[in-house]
Amino acid sequence: MSVVLPLRGVTALSDFRVEKLLQKAAALGLPEVKLSSEFWYFVGSEKALDAATVEKLQALLAAQSVEQTPKAREGLHLFLVTPRLGTISPWASKATNIAENCGLAGIERIERGMAVWLEGALTDEQQQQWAALLHDRMTESVLPDFQTASKLFHHLESETFSTVDVLGGGKEALVKANTEMGLALSADEIDYLVENYQALQRNPSDVELMMFAQANSEHCRHKIFNADFILNGEKQPKSLFGMIRDTHNAHPEGTVVAYKDNSSVIEGAKVERFYPNAAENQGYRFHEEDTHIIMKVETHNHPTAIAPFAGAATGAGGEIRDEGATGKGSRPKAGLTGFTVSNLNIPGLKQPWEQDYGKPEHISSPLDIMIEGPIGGAAFNNEFGRPNLLGYFRTFEEKFDGQVRGYHKPIMIAGGLGSIQAQQTHKDEIPEGALLIQLGGPGMLIGLGGGAASSMDTGTNDASLDFNSVQRGNPEIERRAQEVIDRCWQLGDKNPIISIHDVGAGGLSNAFPELVNDAGRGAVFKLREVPLEEHGLNPLQIWCNESQERYVLSILEKDLDIFRSICERERCPFAVVGTATDDGHLKVRDDLFSNNPVDLPLNVLLGKPPKTTRTDKTVAPSKKPFHAGDIDITEAAYRVLRLPAVAAKNFLITIGDRSVGGMTHRDQMVGKYQTPVADCAVTMMGFNTYRGEAMSMGEKPTVALFDAPASGRMCVGEAITNIAAANIGDIGNIKLSANWMAACGNEGEDEKLYRTVEAVSKACQALDLSIPVGKDSLSMKTVWQDGEEKKSVVSPLSLIISAFAPVQDVRKTVTPELKNVEDSVLLFVDLGFGKARMGGSAFGQVYNNMSGDAPDLDDTSRLKAFYNVIQQLVAEDKLLAYHDRSDGGLFAVLVEMAFAGRCGLDIDLNLLLAQTFITNHTALSQSLRTEEVKALAEWQETIARTLFNEELGAVIQVRKQDVADIINLFYQQQLHHNVFEIGTLTDENTLIIRDGQTHLISDNLIKLQQTWQETSHQIQRLRDNPACADSEFALIGDNGRSALFANLKFDVNEDIAAPFINSGAKPKIAILREQGVNGQIEMAAAFTRAGFDAYDVHMSDLMAGRVHLADFKMLAACGGFSYGDVLGAGKGWAKSILFHPALRDQFAAFFTDPNTLTLGVCNGCQMVSNLAEIIPGTAGWPKFKRNLSEQFEARLSMVHVPKSASLILNEMQGSSLPVVVSHGEGRADFALHGGNISADLGIALQYVDGQNQITQTYPLNPNGSPQGIAGVTNADGRVTIMMPHPERVYRAAQMSWKPEDWTELSGWYRLFAGARKALG
């Protein structure tokens, strides 16, 4: 039993968080109470800690010992919120890590809780309601007193496995176990297992059954996609997967790996990649190598329904691991994400089309999913260090043909692209005797049965089993594991990894067998060698839990020493768990009980269970003609702008780091006003090239209700019209990922799925496209009992297409931002050819008007022709702006382009309206005069169709002088009849849409944009500090204050480092990182460009004495999440130096050396600020605390470089320019100085507004720092720290917006060149 030391911390909840809780309580009718909160820390150890250790703990945790813990009393109620009993929180893992690295011996674990005190009279029932408000039952417990916190450290006794008596009880015994264990085995699979175990003449263990269930779940084996289909009584010729494979067979060119690894690999290019060279003491060098592109997209729907934060976080983490475990190891680079949920029903903003049908108690509401889920996904990406650059958000919940269709089981999609050395793309064969290794985090009792649970309709499983199936994420340890993988593949042909897989559904029980089975091997494992963070787990829990951040891999025994040294340097846990055999048999040995929980042939586990046959019939949707003659067009426009699929997505974007890695060219935010309207994401392949990668998405689920195959073709079409904005070239260079969601088993849905796969396969083959990767989630149905009523919500068939392609020149990417140039016009290309079909449109959704025909990709040759023309115009720099038509139709395209460009529009749709009317009302158009036509309801309907149909198409802005040539290009492709000159830009802040002289819409663009951003604003208010959300909303229309600009006091094209570079002298710079830091590569690249000799220095190198700071002239402490920021950003990193006498002396000596320079950025800034006591001239320095918004802020912000002593900023003084910020704790705090800012403080960087005034206004000042402080320097200017990231934007191509005259380098290169000059 552990000794538990309680320590009292600081206030836990901010004033606005308290106010939100009180508002929620009031909404439940609870009586008024006074609420206070504080953090408490519980330190578990084998024996009582000595006084010196306790003193260090208090300093580390900012906490105090107490003689006795406080108790609740009459009228004062205690709610002690802790991690869920029986689990170990990610916070605890990281905090304990810090204590170990600070030399605090004897500590078993540190956990954190929050004591909430409520003063007031409450009944038992009211206390239960408050408990529900105060904790997340998925991840937390509420304890009645402090003594109960000892249960956090309770150790269970280990148990052995159990068996199911198949020999004695036959099939019935297995049927019973199937239900009790939540295995989701089919009747065929139960028969298969009974037959095989009877042949083996033994009973199956519970471990083997769970392992089989996971390995053979729909989630893992995709049985429906490999099934036979009988539709309307006829056997179909191909499986779903067969039709997907047809696309690759027809167009294999450009694809390196398809269908046989964790990700697909497509051809890239030979580029110079930048990373440390182990043979040169970890010196950063450029390496020219053939580099291919990884593409992967998958979903995490079931866990996100149950626990949105954890579900979305581990969804992102699992997809990242898939990329990293491709081939023999690779590097994830940039991500995408998306969410589809039912109606939000935002309090105070309930929309007229929203109805609340109810939901099962154990799943989260759509609003909670969208408040918590995106934060979970973003937090994982941020902490791991992968920019998220693309996404979508859709809501739908509607009664259609007698069924409620919607997304109570949400779609949470996570994907991305990565880079891989050509020589690492294929796994090698694992030889007999090879070691089988687990790399990454330890196992714990979470995520049991996730694969099987996600394969079931939501609501058909026991609620407790649903909770058991959700994992928890620890991105910081996944980052450490990725660093190990990076060090391995960076060894090139000396890479020790033979083969690698990520650990996902089914845990080790799925990953290890998959690893050896791929090589035709068997294996022997030692169960008790598996690293665990919880005591007392039984064999099933050890072998089958889905603890995240783990990989399995194989190496030769001779490479164990080098692999161990890499892991030790990165502080990444690993264990040799097994050995490969040549007998095809799987044995898991438990030495604790001297038995074998698993002992069976692999062909029983992964053999061919009976093939599934799916039988279904066509269920045709009811057809209702589309009518909209009585709808006010302006009102419709405002409704459409509020629909989440159309509305601004700021609340989903600014929470995600979009610049980490320094390879981002085009993120979601466009132009000098940073408007979230980009069509595609674009990254660069290296720091010395403009080659890159692009990715886009296409999804049209509401269309599937009307015509499922059409929805599939439209998804492909939308992905192509989105990615066409990038400089790709031949359409065959684009490769697609297809993610399929359906409610299989619901009558008619299997048939829709089959016909849609068939349609997409044929369309892709006609377009020269292939689908080398994808995933399915085919249990998209939620069922529950509501009193006497059985309810269900069935999702429409939902295909999400993600397109990936190599880019020839990222600088040619075109955005939707309208350019304020003279003599430009807007052209509209209508790929719907006047049909203007309205089925499934945003317009229909906001009026509950589920009628009309489905839009479709009727002619693939015309889409290809359109793409070819756009690509030629992109390559020739003929497009000023480009935006494809999608949700919200042409109206949404126009207003989004206007929002981005902050300019008015004068649009005349006369000819387009005529085409729409003639196409849909041919007889009327031939028999009536124009004025008679315009008096008809059909004409009003034509206006609605023209403005709001969502057929494929695009608007382009071009110079007037180029119009004739551009029309001729479309003529050559036989598309000229579908190109319309529709209008021009104006100086007025007004949108005018006309039919000749008749105004259809005439409205203020500020008002329209406020409506467009209202949904995002309201969710942001509920999630973050509402005062900050309101401040950002109030800036809409204040163009002068919110515009980005550059005012440099130097020549951006002059390289002041050039003379020093030409001299050949290269000062050595230590690029310093700690575990969890993720910004080292771009920091090293920036300094290398300025003539430094950069070296990768890990804190473990300094602690082990492999490296000494005295060998360097400069130190750069990098950004990221050292130890996951668990004790305050940068604090744990700093304490590991201050509490280590040798390191403290080494750093102090470096800081006092007059010949050195230091730069701390972001997490490095926070860390160095905590070392102020050993840095001369830092009196008055702030610490950095949580942002005022209490949210991670990723922005392109304006800063000013004031006059200061800073040597590295000396050459930039007086300049103002945009810079990337990405942090959660960047607010300069002067509490240690009584809240006073010293007149002598060396302020080196300040946030300013668009008028170059120091600002406190959020988000122009993204964190609330007083006096706009973004960076400070010490008295002699040798040590400068800042929260923004100049290293991520030293190249002009890295900036989301830049002045036109910035070509190769941005203004921020001057900082790095200035450092080189300062060292002489």
UniProtKB/Swiss-Prot annotation:
Name of the featured protein: Phosphoribosylformylglycinamidine synthase
Annotated HAMAP family: PurL_1 (MF_00419)
Gene: purL
Family per record: In the N-terminal section; belongs to the FGAMS family.
Record has Cytoplasm as a keyword: yes
Domain of life: Bacteria
Keywords: ATP-binding, Cytoplasm, Glutamine amidotransferase, Ligase, Magnesium, Metal-binding, Nucleotide-binding, Purine biosynthesis
Subunit record text: Monomer.
Biological processes per GO annotation: 'de novo' IMP biosynthetic process
